[in-house]
Amino acid sequence: MSESLNQLLHESFSKNWNHKALCDLGKTPLTYGEAAQQIVKLHLLLQEAGIKPQDKIALCGKNSANWSMAFLAAITYGAVPVPILNDFKAESIHNIVNHSDARILWLDDAVLNAISLNEMPTLEVVMQLGDFTPVYSKEEKVIKFCSELDKTFAEKYPNFGINDLVFHKEQPEEIALINYTSGSTGFSKGVVLPYRALWSNVRFAIDNITYLKADDGMINMLPLAHMYGLAIEMLFPLCKGCYVYFLGKTPSPKILMGAFAQVQPKLIIAVPLILEKIIRSKVLPTLQKPLLNFLMHIPGVSNLILSKVRKQLIAAFGGQLEMIVLGGAALNGDIEDLLRRMKFPYTVGYGMTECAPLIAYAPWYEIRKASCGKIVDRMEARIVPLHDGEDVGELWVKGSNTMLGYYKNQEATDSTFKDGWMNTGDLCIFDKDGFLYIKGRNKNLILGPSGQNIYPEEIEDKINNLPYVAESLVVDREGMLVALIVPDFDKAKQDGIDAEAVKELINNNRAALNKMLASYSQITRFEMRDEEFEKTPKRSIRRFLYK
């Protein structure tokens, strides 16, 4: 690997020094040069705090320009950033900080108010993302240094310029970051990603999304604490000399449309739910009007109508749209049929945290219905059938994008890798031309409204601890989480409670359950079952039978 991630970043900062780089919603944009200045200030701070290459630095806050600069400061210093989803409950944040051996924690006000620093005894410095001021430091000298940081910087760099910007020269197999797929004890896995994986993802995006040019804007909607948002909505555009516009939180349709109009993005990265909502609210009501519905059945006329709808839809996205890349979940079949009929520029990719994240992709004009593209550059894939003679099987991959393993979890690492191949846990099939189709996800992952990973087993673990619950199964129904519950009728009978009363009692505990869950993973409805779930010989629930 002659090229590296930090080299790509350094070249982009150098070429685009006076161009826009980072912008928070409603704020003045920062140039690449201004961002570089803040990054170098943070390098000085890390040095004063005694941070060495490969030391861990946790980040937990809403998406923002400062979050981005904190991450870039860590990775270009040679430290290992540990991004944490700010929607996680306090206990999960404590678990990740402790398990990752983080020495520094950068956070925002909301996270600071939610957590307890006493639960993270190994932390040496805690800093605000809002203004990069210290909240806590084991050593007084760090707080003093922070108060004089601007003065120290000005003295060290009286005429700060690109020649003063020095980035860590990484090795391909060196740890770049640790990304936790969850925060709960017992479920937590820290995915250890090397620099080669980040570089390979960014390089693929640069080579295959050629219409994005320096000075183009990208809107960040997905969580930066997840690899999809981090690699494709932040690192990739910054390596291209683009600017990133941070919405900061799940936006209202009004804010989103305003951002599209202002930024006029050529590329939008999203989860399918966002596009599906726009189609259902903006397009379907129009097409379902009696007259248009009639005209849609007339050959030729329907094409004219769909062409007009396509133009209106692209205008709603800012007017310059070249492509929307969807990932993280399957696109609704009916919506996909409509998008294909109107030749709308969408595509569906496939990836996972363990591949930082890309595994498969194809541009919109090549993608096939229900497919998620072809295996990306520098990666190989094979299907391992669960049963002899079947085309569908588990997808195994290897190549530049794959992780090193799970942090401090050799057992999980060993169970995922075999002879250099990594098991994705997803059931897939290839067609004769190499397009990949996902038939089912062994990992049962559910995608939240803004791209958050929802692990149903974790929610079920909490539900099963509620009074009179025998077993449960969490399913996704059109974006709403529903818990299928089998009450413990025997226990209820022993306590003199009849069947209907125990169902009501369990239902009354839904609010208490949701208080234990992040907002995006809360249960909309309990649905009671009179019979237990069908099981495998190992007594695992046959999840695919229940929707």
Please give the residue ranges for each predicted region.
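Conserved AMP-binding/adenylate-forming core of the ANL superfamily
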Residues: H10, N18-G50, D55-S64, S68-L72, ...
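Conserved pre-ATP/AMP-binding loop-to-beta segment of ANL
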Residues: W17, K151-Y180, F187, Y211-G217
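Conserved AMP-binding A3 loop
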Residues: T31-G33, A176-V202
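Conserved structural elements of the adenylate-forming
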Residues: A36-K41, V191-K213, M221
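AMP-binding/adenylate-forming catalytic core of the ANL superfamily
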Residues: L105, G399, G405, L427-S519
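Conserved AMP-binding/adenylation subdomain of ANL enzymes
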Residues: W199-G217, M227-K311, Q320
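Gly/Ser/Thr-rich phosphate-binding loop
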Residues: K266-I269, I279-I367, A470
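Conserved ATP-binding/catalytic segment of the ANL
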Residues: I375, R382, G389-E390, E394-G448
